[in-house]
């Protein structure tokens, strides 16, 4: 998705007071400064937990071993905590050297505030590095035609996972349409099995349902109008229809009881699927690696199934399209020293595009953003990797997750309204009115 049409209000102009300073102190790093040991020490913040944290740490260890005169120091945070801490740090001018993110609207706010380095010329001078990265992943790292973030790690479509053993036990088949999903809900409930696992407290997990239902109902144009800042874009009739579908799912008990108190960071939603307490789950492709790591023999024994989210009968959307994260991204803080920026660029041009990096993500069950990865799709994970690669490459449109495509200000309002929608605290029309009020911010 091109970022050149973004027009967002800058959230970084806010003053960070004592609360911000306290939050920074809790982060365990002093921000953009280098250590006083004679080495240039570049700071790297990213997400904790499997499967990503061990791979990120392994990359840093490889780099530090190969470059003894420099050092990269990593600090890891859970997903939701990271989003707040990185926002606070950047607003205070205390960002780490390397800023991990999802691109899109969040990156645009950093660019507007001159907080990140323009990498366009660097990639021009290092064409061999750029050629090792899938071209389609650069869109979310590009703002106004310039590259401000390097695509890293994996392509992550959102998919529908299901527990094959539960389906066999109940005697039903995987859904081929949204109508099939609706038919399955009472059948699983009758057997005391939740139709869908959902970590509703995290909010962005709920958002996946809105993204797919709107796309399958109306195609990409409605959200494209929102993204472009068109006034009252959320008032499209397809949005009200989608929101009504969501609330009907809640009323029909499509989701695990107590979903609004379950967090994604705890991986409790994953456990509900692999333990058979839930039959299905809409989640990111990274879920596979979590279930391999935490689910015992579940995946290896053939218990996990997956598919692209099915189409809606009569809908305008193409069921081959997908949504999710076209990649993850690393930017370089413009407030960091020249020496630390040089360390980051060397990390970009060597370790992050080496064969070990590619192999690490494949082994985790991920499809790397790096080219020529298909030859590594072997062993127990081969079919999953091929299928995720096919979904990502076969989609005419691979839309970026809404909360990443929009500005952080709008994204927070979006997520708050989504939580209220799932808790039946607001009506579809109230949701539309609230979201129309922040379009273009």
Task: Label the predicted regions.
Residues 2-113, 124-128, 174, 339, ...:
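Conserved N-terminal structural module of periplasmic/extracytoplasmic solute-binding proteins
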Residues 66, 252-254, 295-363:
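Extracytoplasmic/periplasmic substrate-recognition and gating elements
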Residues 76-85, 178-183, 259-271:
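Short helix-initiation/N-cap motifs at beta->coil->alpha
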Residues 104-158, 182:
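Hinge/lid segment of periplasmic solute-binding proteins
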Residues 151, 227, 324, 366-374, ...:
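C-terminal capping/gating helix-and-loop segments adjacent to ligand/active sites or protein-protein/ligand interfaces
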């Amino acid at each position: 998705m091109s970022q050149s049409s973004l027009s967002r209000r800058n959230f970084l102009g806010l003053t960070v007071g004592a609360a911000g300073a306290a939050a920074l102190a809790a982060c365990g790093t002093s921000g953009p400064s280098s250590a006083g040991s004679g080495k240039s020490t570049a700071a790297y913040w990213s997400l904790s937990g499997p499967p990503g944290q061990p791979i990120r740490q392994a990359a840093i260890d490889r780099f530090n071993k190969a470059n003894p005169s420099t050092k990269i120091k990593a600090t890891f945070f859970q997903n939701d905590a990271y989003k707040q801490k990185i926002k606070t740090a950047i607003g205070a001018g205390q960002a780490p050297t390397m800023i991990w993110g999802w691109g899109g609207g969040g990156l645009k706010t950093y660019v507007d505030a001159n907080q990140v380095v323009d990498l366009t010329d660097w990639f021009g001078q290092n064409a061999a590095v750029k050629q090792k990265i899938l071209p389609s992943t650069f869109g979310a790292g590009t703002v106004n035609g310039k590259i401000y973030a390097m695509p890293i790690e994996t392509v992550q479509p959102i998919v529908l996972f299901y527990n094959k053993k539960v389906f066999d036990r109940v005697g039903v088949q995987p859904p081929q349409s949204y109508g099939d999903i609706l038919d399955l809900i009472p059948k699983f409930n009758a057997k005391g099995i939740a139709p869908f696992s959902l970590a509703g407290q995290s909010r962005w997990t709920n958002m996946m349902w809105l993204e797919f239902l709107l796309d399958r109902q109306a195609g990409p144009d409605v959200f494209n109008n929102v993204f472009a800042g068109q006034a009252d874009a959320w008032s499209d009739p397809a949005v009200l229809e989608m929101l009504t579908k969501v609330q009907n799912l809640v009323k029909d008990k499509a989701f695990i009881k107590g979903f609004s108190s379950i967090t994604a960071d705890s991986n409790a939603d994953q456990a509900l699927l692999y333990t058979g307490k839930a039959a299905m789950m809409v989640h990111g492709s990274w879920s596979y690696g979590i279930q391999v790591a935490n689910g015992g023999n579940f995946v290896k024994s053939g218990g996990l199934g997956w598919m692209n989210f099915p189409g809606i009968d009569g809908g305008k959307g193409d069921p081959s399209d997908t949504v999710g994260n076209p990649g993850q991204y690393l930017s370089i803080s413009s407030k960091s020293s020249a020496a630390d920026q040089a360390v980051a660029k060397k990390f970009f041009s060597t370790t992050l595009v080496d064969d070990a990096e590619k192999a690490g993500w494949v082994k985790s069950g991920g499809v790397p953003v790096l080219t020529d990865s298909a030859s590594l799709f072997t062993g127990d994970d081969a079919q999953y990797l091929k299928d995720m690669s096919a979904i990502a490459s076969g989609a005419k449109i691979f839309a970026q997750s809404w909360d990443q495509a929009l500005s952080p200000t709008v994204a927070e309002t979006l997520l708050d309204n989504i939580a209220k929608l799932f808790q039946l605290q607001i009506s579809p029309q109230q949701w539309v009115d609230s979201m129309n009020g922040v379009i273009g911010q």
